[in-house]
Amino acid sequence: MSESLRIIFAGTPDFAARHLDALLSSGHNVVGVFTQPDRPAGRGKKLMPSPIKVLAEEEGLPVFQPVSLRPQENQQLVADLQADVMVVVAYGLILPKAVLEMPRLGCINIHGSLLPRWRGAAPIQRSLWAGDAETGVTIMQMDVGLDTGDMLYKLSCPITAEDTSGTLYDKLAELGPQGLITTLKQLADGTAKPEVQDETLVTYAEKLSKEEARIDWSLSAAQLERCIRAFNPWPMSWLEIEGQPVKVWKASVIDTATNAAPGTILEANKQGIQVATGDGILNLLSLQPAGKKAMSAQDLLNSRREWFVPGNRLV
């Protein structure tokens, strides 16, 4: 194989752990792992380690958990490892310019979109939300900007009509490690060909919020159906009935024109709960009332038919 590189890995969630796992079997030398501090989790608010910390400790790797990389003493932790390259995957901390310049080959990042489209915090969700036909991963050389560095390698995958953010996350978690290993080989061989991002093609993937996930019936049925998939598994599209939030897990579009006001219930039967939108009809197929499990529209109608009387309006 190519030259074995000394690598610092920085990441936090499961998505990052899949990349570290691939690195550990690649023949490269992971000399240290940076991850976020343990966080309170669960009902007992017990301090829990990140998936990266768990994996790194299982493998006997040195683990560092600074709150910030701005203090000089924390930057020294990076310098002391004398790495060839630092691999950053969903780390969650800003890397100051001094840290970016420490490794011989700099720092590289795996981003969950085909840059320059969807720079920012929620690229997987926004690609679905916007109705993109494909997405993928970009491995880029990091600089001080937000996902602005030169692109080193890309892998793409189609977005299907059934994809949710959850399924797309899994697809990209398979692609990312493949792209990472290829990029490291090119960096080691000196064959990497950095490509500058075209600033005219930039879009930004803003963070999601629970309020954005509230169903706005003035939007088109097609847009709402995409939102339902984009916001699954978080924050989940929802509507309010009698003061209670009801999550929507699945819906379909019925391409039939209607003059009914957006939010008007048109039909409620075993085929679903059909609601007028700003353009077309949205057929609600799977819902989850507060405190209950997700269920089919038919099962919900069996217990709460009064919520979905045709002619009534959802707000």
UniProtKB/Swiss-Prot annotation:
High-level lineage: Bacteria, Pseudomonadati, Pseudomonadota, Gammaproteobacteria, Enterobacterales
Top-rank taxon: Bacteria
Residues that hold (6S)-5,6,7,8-tetrahydrofolate according to the record: S113, L114, L115, P116
EC code(s) of this entry: 2.1.2.9
Family the UniProt entry places it in: Belongs to the Fmt family.
Transport in keyword set: no
Function: Attaches a formyl group to the free amino group of methionyl-tRNA(fMet). The formyl group appears to play a dual role in the initiator identity of N-formylmethionyl-tRNA by promoting its recognition by IF2 and preventing the misappropriation of this tRNA by the elongation apparatus.
CDD domains: FMT_core_Met-tRNA-FMT_N, Met_tRNA_FMT_C
UniProt-recorded Gene Ontology molecular function terms: methionyl-tRNA formyltransferase activity
InterPro entries to which the protein is assigned, alphabetical: Fmt, Formyl_trans_C, Formyl_trans_C_sf, Formyl_transf_N, Formyl_transf_N_sf, Formyl_transferase-like_C_sf, GART_AS, Met-tRNA-FMT_C
The name this protein goes by in its record: Methionyl-tRNA formyltransferase
Reactions it catalyzes: L-methionyl-tRNA(fMet) + (6R)-10-formyltetrahydrofolate = N-formyl-L-methionyl-tRNA(fMet) + (6S)-5,6,7,8-tetrahydrofolate + H(+)
Keyword terms of this UniProt record: Protein biosynthesis, Transferase
Top-level class of the enzyme under EC nomenclature: transferase
Gene Ontology cellular component terms for the protein in this record: cytosol
Annotated PROSITE patterns: GART
